[in-house]
Amino acid sequence: MIPQRIKELEAYKTEVTPASVRLSSNEFPYDFPEEIKQRALEELKKVPLNKYPDPEAKELKAVLADFFGVKEENLVLGNGSDELIYYLSIAIGELYIPVYIPVPTFPMYEISAKVLGRPLVKVQLDENFDIDLERSIELIEKEKPVLGYFAYPNNPTGNLFSRGKIEEIRNRGVFCVIDEAYYHYSGETFLEDALKREDTVVLRTLSKIGMASLRVGILIGKGEIVSEINKVRLPFNVTYPSQVMAKVLLTEGREFLMEKIQEVVKERERMYDEMKKIEGVEVFPSKANFLLFRTPYPAHEVYQELLKRDVLVRNVSYMEGLQKCLRVSVGKPEENNKFLEALEESIKSLSSSL
């Protein structure tokens, strides 16, 4: 029998609507140069497809440890960060003890808890999209959650939560998962805490820096925590092709990546400045590779107007506190220009129809 908690869930939906400018999934806008991809494919040809992959992904771990400036024993790898979020929801605290989540945020935190039947302590962000510390402390003292998820920067709002507020919550016995999926666009991290403390881990991913198709997520933590999380990790969870290709792309493509990441940051700031000039658009500062914006019009109408102009963004107005809001990923300059033009036209079209 399917339990009621599963029946009440909805399958996670990804955006598959066709458009020539797709700025809805926070993907890295640049593919690797052909010569680097060719090197990765050469290594891929050597993979024995009839054999299971290295269950510990030792060679990839060595490259990732160097890339992030940590030791191999501080790493757990997953089939994307989503898998690691599930492992943390399984391993940290008894399943009847609540999970703390500031909202709106990345949906997988809530989904992983609900799948396991874990109670939730959800606290709405304040008007600046920061943690409402007073309300959080009130509910933490009452409900006693032992696990908390913090997207840093937060998705979909793009801002960094106040570090001191996260530390205050941690001081009240909440194990803190700091999801740094967008670390390369903010430069802010809890990595030092994760390496020294047993109540903090950091999540990173290769998906936001050009390797989304490989599905490689990284948990960074103290050795004792890593050992416990590994007990619930599924065997052979990172495929051989992903291990081999990520290793090549991170070593031979590192200079390319760092250069293009800076281009994305530069484009983000340009988009922010240009969006502020469009009458009726309120755009919020971001430390990620996307921007949240609000208009006076229903979000689904703005979404459709943009789609008419062959531009796809994400409608996030269904999320707590984000009425009339949409999220746009930072693309290549020419894609961003097309979005900016389409947004201005869309707003004019909607205003003239009133």
Swiss-Prot record:
Pfam families: Aminotran_1_2. Transmembrane segments: none annotated. Its cofactor is pyridoxal 5'-phosphate. The keyword Mitochondrion does not apply. The keyword Amino-acid biosynthesis applies. Its EC number is 2.6.1.9. InterPro entries: Aminotransferase_I/II_large, HisP_aminotrans, HistidinolP_aminotransfase, PyrdxlP-dep_Trfase, PyrdxlP-dep_Trfase_major, PyrdxlP-dep_Trfase_small. The modification N6-(pyridoxal phosphate)lysine is found at residue 208. It comes from the Bacteria. GO terms for biological process: L-histidine biosynthetic process. CDD domains: AAT_like. It catalyses: L-histidinol phosphate + 2-oxoglutarate = 3-(imidazol-4-yl)-2-oxopropyl phosphate + L-glutamate. Pathway: Amino-acid biosynthesis; L-histidine biosynthesis; L-histidine from 5-phospho-alpha-D-ribose 1-diphosphate: step 7/9. Keywords: Amino-acid biosynthesis, Aminotransferase, Histidine biosynthesis, Pyridoxal phosphate, Transferase. One of its GO terms (molecular function) is pyridoxal phosphate binding. Homodimer. Belongs to the class-II pyridoxal-phosphate-dependent aminotransferase family. Histidinol-phosphate aminotransferase subfamily. This is Histidinol-phosphate aminotransferase. The lineage of its organism: Bacteria, Pseudomonadati, Aquificota, Aquificia, Aquificales. The gene is hisC.
